[in-house]
Amino acid sequence: MDEEAGITPELIEVRADERFDEARIAAYLRNRVPGSDLPLTVRQFARGKANLTYLLTYGDPRTPAREYVLRRPPLGPVAPGSHDMGREYRVLSTLWRAFPLAARAYLFCDDESVLGAPFFVMERRRGVVVQGVIPPEFGGGEDAGANRKLSEVVVDTLAEFHAVDPDSAGLGDLGYPEGFMQRQLQGWLGRWGRARHEPNSLVDELSVWLEETMPTSPGPTLLHNDWRLDNMAVDPGDPGRCVAVYDWDMCTRGDPFADVGTLMACWFDRDEQSIFLDPMPTRSRGFMTRREAILRYGRKSGRDVSNMNWYLVFGTFKLAVILQQIYIRWLRGQTRDERFSNMGKDAATLFEMAADRRSA
């Protein structure tokens, strides 16, 4: 893949500060996963800004006998309840039976003396991950038909996932679906309160609106909690065929529209103001509009989507708070990365967008 075209390569050599003792890992995994008696080669997946993901290749890397993926939390202190490798392992050790697009997890290790953090090992799925730029496999953004398929597959696969019976997946006791959205809203309002650095009447008004207009949740389903196109892999020969869904560490049970709102918050229409990050290439010719995507989810899932604006606004509000949290760390001198110096403006833009989307 071409980095100059804005496309991140899939695999890189392990970053210097994210290396681990490969011999120790090889010794630990020997006889614990099939094929682990062969020589081990480790590379790192370039995508992802939180949990660290590595490719474990056993045998000749050109014709590997076995490939696995190792996942661990990011370096440094981790907030309680976040980057939960045990949770992700639990989900992936059983979900694949009911939802084959979830990779199968084989092993979990919470002995931090092995790697320095909990980790788990799962199967590798091969496919194309589409981030902010459409890769050349799918026409580089110029193929409207391929773009349409990409926009459809991310919606259709979400509806398929929400149709999974939690009990049949062995996850009927996951999370606490009762009062899920109320807890979510109060949690994010609290994060905003801790990250704000000056009065903001627009966000105050938006917060009241979110509290006063929260709709009644439909029946609970399994939730991914970070459903986006760049958390999926698609068949390189068919952009309309998903081969894997990634990043399950926040999976729980709750309101299915929370997933839709997260997805739609990242779904920018062509006439909307651009911000520094467009996590999905939804402005590309041929992509469904956000409204078309919402209606398609309603048809595919059989759910009434007439209250989806609330979830769209809340999803956009969450994006804004995330940027504000990063900005306040820069403002307080907790990070010196100058890329974060403008995130306060970007957060303000997203708060304005959230307010506008109340009537979208």
For the regions a language model picked out, list residue spans one by one:
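Catalytic-loop of the protein kinase fold
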Residues: 222-224, 229
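ATP-binding pocket architecture of kinase catalytic cores
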Residues: 39-222, 237-240
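Helical subdomain adjoining the active site within ATP-dependent kinase catalytic cores
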Residues: 303-307, 321-360
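Activation of the activation-loop gatekeeper triad in protein kinase-fold domains
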Residues: 246-251
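Active-site activation/catalytic loop segments of kinase-like enzymes and analogous catalytic loops
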Residues: 258-301, 315-332
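All-alpha amphipathic helical-bundle segments outside canonical DNA-binding/catalytic cores
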Residues: 149, 175-176, 304-315
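Hydrophobic residue at the +6 position relative to the catalytic HRD Asp in the kinase catalytic loop
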Residues: 232-234
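Juxta-kinase regulatory segment immediately upstream of eukaryotic protein kinase catalytic domains
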Residues: 2-36
